Amino acid sequence: MNKNISPVKGTHDLYGQDMEKFNYVVELFYSIANKFNFDAIQTPIIENQELFSRSVGELTDIVSKEMYSFVDKNESILCLRPEATSGIARFAASNYQSGSLKFSTHGPMFRRERPQKGRYRQFYQINIENIGEKSPYIDFEIIYIASTFINKLGISNDKYNLLINSLGSAEDQNNFSNLLRDYLSNFKKKLSETSLSRLDKNPLRILDSKDDGDKEILINAPKIYEHLSKESKEYFSKIKMFLSDNGISFQE
């Protein structure tokens, strides 16, 4: 007697109307990205694990808990990509030395998360990446494209909220990390095991903790927006000005 084989847990098949909707979303995305001069790219699904350990961070949940990794016959440590940005950055670093690069992509990503409604172990992302140039207008443009895409899908502005913030410059983040570390060091006995392991190397990751005890400790923690440099505050203000001038509502 034959026994049917089910899809792997956390994955699902796309067929019929679901496939038609999927194709419509992807085609709409590329048509909008193309109007803003983003070049389509596809990077491999399989990458060296080191790429994500270095770019995403060894202490992140993505790398430490959720990534599908394996050793191939040549003893290389490979993985199924958990996100698209790192692969595009690898491509750009290997093929271009300077200039502004604009890429668009879509495809399957893989994370060993607990499956639930709207969350799968194989899921699909669409990405736009602007590499090599920094300006408030570029940040605004990406948000503008995302807003345009959502509206073109027939989702009105009152159906979603746009939340924005700023981590500031690398120097701002480093200074804030030290402040946060000093604050959290007073709660070593109360922090979760995961957060305690992040305290010395990357305390900013503790801000993402889902542990209820950690969340309570973080209520009175320093707030990064209170410690941004003058330059970073001006940069962020320009982004907000561009959004307001173009009728895009947002919350901080």
Question: What annotation goes with each model-predicted range?
Answer:
Residues M1-E252:
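TRNA-recognition modules of translation machinery and tRNA-sensing kinases, especially anticodon-binding
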